[in-house]
């Protein structure tokens, strides 16, 4: 029945087109840490040499965290910076956009801020009228978006934010790709926010006690809105690229891997973590490369080298398996989000789930083809408020002002127009009929 529903919808629904326009030239020029104005080598704690433990240890953290630098995080009221995110992970209280405090009962062991590389820091810079970037015509609608008088969770505020968020990407992409919005100016904002995110990771890294990572999210999708997002995590911060590789460099994940390989040749080690393959419309683990050619040894080696981990659970659903793919598993339907990201279009099941990918990889190996799907698993939050809640009793979801109450998330009856509107907003953002708890 689920397969029939997908086929019927695919035949009858107009699919939103993705953006595959190359805007920025790919580069691997390194940003030396001493060039960063707020980085001081004297403030960094010394490296700690730790013997490999005889027994394995479990460490808990989050490698998928958004702050005020992500365009969607800022649009939904997030003011928390990467510095605030690391304070939260270490056990301090930080403010939710709705005004209440968020705090862990037990600090985390590791944390990585992974703001979207595409338009990194751009909405924040557009809204802040003290910045040079805010002076361009494009920025005017965003002026004062998160000023104190606009930080309510009422109906008008939610409608305004929905309108801002829904129009931002299409308008920003159109103006950037056409050249109407100065590309160098956009790139300048991105590079500045990237340096600040690195500095925050440096400031809070405490070897042997609390580990931070310089990181970001690569946000790509196929033409039919199949999700191909990855979080890119760097091993160190001594030398890093001047700018993160984004879909404005290429929408092809294989080009991301090549960029990572080129940086690796310069001594810069990293890994990419795919997430929400459940919304990839069969593209994340398909048995063909980006061009549609059969998988070969070079593809397998490059994917294994760059993507040793897959995120299989987060707020936008699980990516382990689906009831159609695992009919004898009574838990296969747990936290399923069956839609492509940011649409109401169903996602094809085959090629979208990790357990099936493992089986397909084993089958390839039995055919004498190197298995490209050799990976471990991780769970993350994808919070967009800088705070990763890990207790169901203290959970406020991920979208700031539009998901801060039980009514808005749909876990309590919507007794007012504001709560119902927020729930409809969540559905419009691709959460389908799922209730965010």
Where are these regions (language model features)?
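Extended, charged catalytic domains and RNA/DNA-binding interfaces, predominantly
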Residues: 6-7, 12-437
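Short, aromatic- and glycine-rich surface loops/edge beta-strands on solvent-exposed regions
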Residues: 2-4
């Amino acid at each position: 029945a689920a397969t029939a529903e997908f086929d019927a919808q695919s035949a009858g629904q107009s699919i939103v087109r993705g953006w595959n326009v190359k805007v920025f030239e790919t580069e691997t020029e390194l940003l030396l840490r001493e060039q960063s104005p707020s980085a001081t080598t004297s403030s960094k704690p010394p490296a700690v040499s730790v013997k490999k433990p005889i027994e394995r240890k479990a460490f808990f953290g989050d490698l998928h965290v958004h702050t005020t630098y992500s365009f969607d995080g800022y649009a939904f009221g997030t003011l928390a910076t990467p510095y605030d995110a690391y304070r939260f992970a270490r056990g301090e209280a930080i403010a939710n956009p709705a005004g209440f405090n968020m705090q862990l009962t037990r600090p985390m062991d590791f944390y990585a801020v992974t703001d979207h590389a595409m338009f990194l820091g751009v909405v924040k810079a557009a809204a802040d009228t003290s910045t040079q970037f805010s002076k361009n015509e494009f920025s005017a609608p965003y002026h004062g978006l998160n000023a104190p008088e606009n930080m309510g969770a009422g109906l008008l505020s939610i409608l305004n934010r929905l309108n801002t968020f829904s129009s931002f990407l299409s308008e920003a992409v159109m103006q950037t790709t056409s050249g109407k919005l100065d590309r160098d100016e956009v790139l300048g904002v991105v590079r500045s926010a990237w340096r600040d995110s690195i500095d925050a990771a440096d400031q809070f890294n405490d070897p042997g006690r609390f580990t931070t990572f310089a990181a970001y999210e690569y946000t790509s999708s196929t033409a039919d809105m199949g999700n191909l997002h990855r979080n890119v995590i760097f091993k160190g911060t001594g030398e890093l690229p001047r700018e993160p590789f984004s879909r404005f460099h290429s929408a092809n994940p294989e080009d991301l891997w090549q960029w990572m390989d080129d940086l690796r040749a310069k001594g810069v080690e990293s890994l990419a973590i795919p997430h929400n393959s459940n919304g990839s419309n069969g593209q994340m683990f398909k048995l063909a490369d980006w061009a549609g050619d059969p998988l070969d040894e070079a593809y397998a080696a490059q994917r294994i080298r760059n993507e040793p981990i897959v995120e299989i659970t987060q707020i936008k659903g699980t990516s382990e398996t689906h009831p159609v793919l695992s009919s004898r598993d009574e838990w296969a339907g747990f936290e399923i989000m069956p839609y492509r990201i940011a649409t109401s279009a169903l996602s094809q099941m085959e090629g979208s789930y990790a357990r099936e990918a493992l089986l397909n990889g084993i089958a390839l190996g039995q055919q004498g083809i190197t298995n490209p799907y050799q990976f471990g698993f991780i769970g993350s939050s994808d919070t967009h408020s800088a705070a990763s809640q890990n207790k169901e009793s203290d959970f406020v979801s991920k979208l700031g002002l539009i998901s801060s109450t039980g009514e808005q998330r749909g876990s309590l009856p919507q007794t007012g127009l504001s709560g119902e509107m927020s729930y409809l907003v969540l559905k419009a953002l691709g959460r389908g009929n799922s209730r965010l708890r």
